[in-house]
Amino acid sequence: MAAQPPRGIRLSALCPKFLHTNSTSHTWPFSAVAELIDNAYDPDVNAKQIWIDKTVINDHICLTFTDNGNGMTSDKLHKMLSFGFSDKVTMNGHVPVGLYGNGFKSGSMRLGKDAIVFTKNGESMSVGLLSQTYLEVIKAEHVVVPIVAFNKHRQMINLAESKASLAAILEHSLFSTEQKLLAELDAIIGKKGTRIIIWNLRSYKNATEFDFEKDKYDIRIPEDLDEITGKKGYKKQERMDQIAPESDYSLRAYCSILYLKPRMQIILRGQKVKTQLVSKSLAYIERDVYRPKFLSKTVRITFGFNCRNKDHYGIMMYHRNRLIKAYEKVGCQLRANNMGVGVVGIIECNFLKPTHNKQDFDYTNEYRLTITALGEKLNDYWNEMKVKKNTEYPLNLPVEDIQKRPDQTWVQCDACLKWRKLPDGMDQLPEKWYCSNNPDPQFRNCEVPEEPEDEDLVHPTYEKTYKKTNKEKFRIRQPEMIPRINAELLFRPTALSTPSFSSPKESVPRRHLSEGTNSYATRLLNNHQVPPQSEPESNSLKRRLSTRSSILNAKNRRLSSQFENSVYKGDDDDEDVIILEENSTPKPAVDHDIDMKSEQSHVEQGGVQVEFVGDSEPCGQTGSTSTSSSRCDQGNTAATQTEVPSLVVKKEETVEDEIDVRNDAVILPSCVEAEAKIHETQETTDKSADDAGCQLQELRNQLLLVTEEKENYKRQCHMFTDQIKVLQQRILEMNDKYVKKETCHQSTETDAVFLLESINGKSESPDHMVSQYQQALEEIERLKKQCSALQHVKAECSQCSNNESKSEMDEMAVQLDDVFRQLDKCSIERDQYKSEVELLEMEKSQIRSQCEELKTEVEQLKSTNQQTATDVSTSSNIEESVNHMDGESLKLRSLRVNVGQLLAMIVPDLDLQQVNYDVDVVDEILGQVVEQMSEISST
């Protein structure tokens, strides 16, 4: 497979030092061991067993890894010893763990400086060497890997390459002769398999980094030495402040949880590792469902309590059945209390991408969202279990301190490697367990598939009553809370810093909000009106507001474009205070020596500027009357900022309907204290995590109300526009009617006084008429701008709703398409199975008829044999009977040969060359086959 470079273009070189550099990605030695185990587990090898052991060869301590998988050819071995070649694919639902084509190189070179690989695949045998020592001795500038290939007759293939590679291997490896290499190939059990030997292990203080002495059936990481306190247990870097689980320093414990559903036996130093079905070995097991927005399908999460050690808890995160992160603490487990102690969560994150060493995930947005969701789900499980157990056993120990047993007992068959569920109470199991030992007769045969799991990926397996109770309590408490909050919100004084009003140029610009948001805030506060309360004394520069104007001017926090995800910015510097005078303040009963000042305020709403003029309003009294006048002036300055002369639009107080329409159509900005109080309300609301759904539903309802109200305003705007057009038309008609035209091409004159008298019924001055006409034009322009603003809000609202509905429809379409695909696949498989069953039925009927025929022939032969035996006694027919017996024996032998060939089609393991047709062996085999066929047909 050595690629030749294009002419004139150089290949990228790989320095031998990269072997060590590449291995440094494994900061923990067991992650390097896991890479070699993964290579045996992957579907292209599909090993049933792997043996890991420590041995000594030529005074070198070595680690050996031997599996009984499919083995490799010399070309495939070359790819394995090269970098980045990974052609692993899923086979029969078995998903490969390997992704990058780098696991063997990084793992083996992390454990030791030199590695040799022996492999055979039934047709050929190969030996390959990956050695840093060899490359240093020959001073190689590129990584070279000697490979020797043998055929099944132990003869070398490709003599030119193999001789040079053989010489290099014999000189720089632990095996000095060809016979020793072949002996290692013979050490591989069976016709296929692979054996890896690693030596020159990484050492620390003249000793290897592994402890082989403390447990003769385990490989452990030595305990850390502390000169002051003495020995202390080994801890991974990320667990320096936690209790380290045994899997951190024991290879046997780590291998037992390495795979979510183990399909391969691991024999460590001669003793089988008792692998765990992690998701089944917990207590109080419940399942929850995670629905990420970035994924079209749901993800199952399993929660339970650790039965062995409550101090080992957290999330077990798997990827393609392989453990990536163990005991990752999330949610309430991160707090400095006993919440979440003992709870273990299990999730298979196939939608995340693992890092280079398969010990962590890439820190992406998807990973962060997943960790957050896991924390919320774990909090729900913890609260539910806490409430449930305290309710059932109020005087008992805390749930984390109760002695627990796994909810179920599962064991793996040593023959077929299938997992079987056992009845409760079966703790003592033999060293080797087979399906035939199963008490359940339904799963007593290795041919029977495993017990199917619950495939419900839509609903959790438990009801979150604690969450619902909190939600109901908050719903009951909310009506009592909102009036109190609104009262504080409307009458709470806010101190303003005086430097911000030193110059008109330093005034903070007003905030522009969408009309839909402001109308929602106005309605929300109007729904919870409270009677006015006495305002406490304060040095605030703001004037008192009437209850109605305060409610109208209050502003809710900013909402996102979809009205779902709310964001509040507390430290906002671009807020100012604007008081909009819509109603005349009644004249106080007692006259005060206070200057009265008319106010004019500007409201900018989405690019539309609207002006209002209110009547004079007296400043409210505070505790000190001496400073009331100055306080009033400052309050006016704070409210109106700068007095800008502008066109005055006079409001007709007599037309109440028009005033109400204007008050509702124009959305008013809010005060600073209103926004601050809304933020406090939101913080109070956010204490309950479940309130998000209710708030979302409320926002959707408010959105519908906004849309309806907007349509109403639009209709009213159109109505007023039509009325104004009618008035304009009447004015034009009056002009045409009462205009005197001169025939001498002089200017046309209009009797304005007569025109006004005709329209209004009374005499009006021309100046007043012009002002009213200008006012009408301004009113038309304002209504047009309001109309355009409302149309803009409607477009935004419709776009938000369309986006929501579109995303939901897309998600439903994807799920429905997946269901239809699965249904089609199931129907195709069902048809295939039907056809196979029909063929088997036909074959069975044919075999049954043939067996019946053979039975009758055998009975006939037996009867003829008995008759001939009785006739032998007569001396007169001795020669004839002998000849007859010879002929019958020949017939019987030929019949047995035919029966044997037929049985070979039914029983493939039957070796006809070892069958003696002169005895009744074939008859016994035929009888057994007939009995089995009858049992099968009866079942």
From Swiss-Prot:
Stored Pfam families: HATPase_c_3 (PF13589), Morc6_S5 (PF17942), zf-CW (PF07496)
UniProt entry tagged with the keyword Acetylation: no
Comp. bias regions, Polar residues: 524-539, 631-640
Record's keyword annotation contains Zinc-finger: yes
PTM annotation: Sumoylation is involved in interaction with PML and localization to PML nuclear bodies.
Zinc finger (CW-type): 404-454
Residue numbers carrying Phosphoserine: 503, 514, 540, 560, 765
One biological process term in Gene Ontology: post-embryonic development
Binding site for Zn(2+): 413, 416, 435, 446
Any coiled-coil regions, as ranges: 686-877
Annotated crosslink Glycyl lysine isopeptide (Lys-Gly) (interchain with G-Cter in SUMO2) location: 191, 205, 231, 280, 293, 555, 597, 650-651, 740, 794, 855
GO molecular function, one term: histone H3K4me3 reader activity
Main localisation: nucleus
Annotated region described as Nuclear matrix binding, given as residue ranges: 326-353
Outcome recorded upon mutating residue 431 to A: Strong decrease of binding to NS1
SUPFAM superfamilies: ATPase domain of HSP90 chaperone/DNA topoisomerase II/histidine kinase (SSF55874)
Recorded domain comment: The CW-TYPE zinc finger mediates its binding to trimethylated histone H3K4me3.
Biological role stated in the UniProt entry: Nuclear matrix protein which forms MORC3-NBs (nuclear bodies) via an ATP-dependent mechanism and plays a role in innate immunity by restricting different viruses through modulation of the IFN response. Mechanistically, possesses a primary antiviral function through a MORC3-regulated element that activates IFNB1, and this function is guarded by a secondary IFN-repressing function. Sumoylated MORC3-NBs associates with PML-NBs and recruits TP53 and SP100, thus regulating TP53 activity. Binds RNA in vitro.
PANTHER family linked: MORC FAMILY CW-TYPE ZINC FINGER PROTEIN 3, ZINC FINGER CW-TYPE COILED-COIL DOMAIN PROTEIN 3
Protein name: MORC family CW-type zinc finger protein 3
Native source species: Homo sapiens
Lineage: Eukaryota, Metazoa, Chordata, Craniata, Vertebrata
